[in-house]
Amino acid sequence: MKDRQYRNFIIFWFSQSVSQLGSSMTSFALIIWSYSRTGSAMSVSLMTFCTWLPYIAASIVAGPVIDRYHKKTIMLLADLLAALCSLTVAALAVSGNLAVWHIFIVNGITGFMNAFQFPAETVAVGMLVPKEKYSQASGLNSFTSSLLTVVTPVMAASLSSFAGIKGVIAFDLATFLFAFSVLLFRIKIPENAGGTETGKKKEKEKISVQESWREGLQFLRGHKQLWYLMISMALMNFFSRLTYEN
């Protein structure tokens, strides 16, 4: 049973990694496109701002929502919304009407979606992977993150120079169809982690957003190390963004 769970995770991890590659390539290609049109670093910074502001705002309620609803459904809806955004950009590019402000709006929608997608995916991994294999799963996710950092600029720039922004988005949509199909038809994510009694109880309880917030804050108050870690990471990200823009 546990081996089957882990095999499902491997399939899930691979398909999501492929999809992340497509999404990362599109984001990078749009940065290139925006800068080539405007010659302004400010436009690139605004693209990032339009992504992260909705992400931060939506994160306030994302946790309780993810706790209350099925993780697979949330991921499917988020993926579908991201694909619609890519299709919109592709249609505008084909028609010759794509403008930088369109990308600002699309990035805002994508950032909002990611506030639900990323945590839901993280929780889903915990549900798919047996506890004794958590470190292996974490290693694979770290490998994906590092690999994407290296290969995304090369692949996005190469494909963009050869096929334009439309070619990059076409590749992104192909990776979306692959990951979406795998998640929809192949991956079964349990309603609660490991079928535990605690998980079942929480699924039955219809706790409010305020109660979820209170529970989360109580947990953090009892684990001060998490506060220190969160503050440290926030400061690192803030200062690194002063000199680095992806």
Can you name each region flagged by the protein language model?
Residues 17, 92, 98-116, 234-235:
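Hydrophobic core of transmembrane alpha-helices in multi-pass small-molecule transporters
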Residues 106-153:
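Cytoplasmic helix-loop-helix junction between adjacent transmembrane helices
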Residues 163-170, 214-246:
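A single, central transmembrane helix in multi-pass transporters
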Residues 80-97:
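C-terminal ends and interior cores of transmembrane alpha-helices
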Residues 96, 123, 127, 169-201:
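Helix-loop junctions on the cytosolic side of multi-pass membrane transporters
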Residues 1-9, 189-230:
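Juxtamembrane intracellular "pre-TM" segments in multi-pass secondary transporters
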